[in-house]
Structure formats: structure tokens, C-alpha cells
């Protein structure tokens, strides 16, 4: 395990801290993971952990970002689904299921943590890019895309933090939400005429 010394490149020490923190946050959650526990797992003092990540929220955000980036790379390099926005959405949600506890805790902390807001902003932009492509493929051209996107975002956010068991393929949930949101947006538009 890289020690916090000048003989080990900073990037390796920082990566070791992040790997240890990610494992602890995943298994123990935010509340039960301390900076001291992360330092102990890596073999450095808590102050050394804080040198790389100034706050526990920064470390937590970096852990969530690492999970998202690894999932995104997997998705974008998978020839079977890369370029298919529907399949990419389903796969990202599938890969995030084991981390729902972390997502719940992140949502609780977001109001107080710029770092967490930034990470979730990136995740939401990625989801929205794919979601808009799915909507564009299925919705009439005059549907209120903003309303449809907002409804779908609420669903995706709920799925990321839900404690309910997922008992069917995620593609079914995506189809249901997109179809329902498009239907509601179309019906609202028709009522206003």
C-alpha cells in the first residue's frame, strides 16, 4: 500500500486513498466511514487523507465520481450497447443499483456539499443526453421535452435511491416512464388547445 512519502508518486497515493474510501463507503456507508478508517486502510495518517481530499464530502464525492466514470467507460466501450441511448441508460442504472445506499446518503448531503452537487450534475447531464435521444425517437415533435425530461429525471433519481427490489428488466421501467411522460405531456398540450 503506498505510504504518504515522496518516494511514491502522488497519483498512486491519491488513488490508493480513493480506492480504500470507495470500498469503505460502499460497504459501510457515509456515516460509518471515517477519515481515520480510510487512513488506516491505506496505512497513512488521517491528516494525509485530508491532504488529498480536504473534507469527507470531497472524498465521498470523489468515490461516487469514480464509480460513475468506471460505469460510463464500461458502457461506452461495450460494442453491444455503445451508441444506443436506451441501452446505455438501462446499463448505467443497472450498474448503479449496488450503490443505492451511497446515492441516498449523497442526496442527503447535496445541499451542503458543492462537490456532491458537481458529481450529480455530471451524472444528470450524461443521463439527460441519452434520455433526450430516447424521447426524440418516440415523442411527437411538438411535445414539451422539458416536462418529459423532468418527469423522467425524477424517476431516475428515485431509482438511484430506492430501497425497493427491482424485479424486472430496467428497460421496462425506462419504457414505462418515457411513454407515460410523453403521453401526459401530449394530453396536457391537447387540453390547452
Predicted regions and their residues:
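Cytochrome P450 catalytic-core helices
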Residues: 156
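N-terminal intrinsically disordered/low-complexity leader segments
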Residues: 1-12, 23, 189-193
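Amphipathic alpha-helical segments used for helix-helix packing
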Residues: 95-121, 161-164
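Helix-turn-helix
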Residues: 12, 16, 20-58, 62
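Short, basic, alpha-helical segments at the C-terminal edge of helix-turn-helix-like DNA-binding modules
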Residues: 65-71
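Amphipathic alpha-helical packing segments from all-alpha helical-bundle domains
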Residues: 72, 95, 114-140, 146-150, ...
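Hydrophobic alpha-helical connector segments
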Residues: 62, 73-98, 149
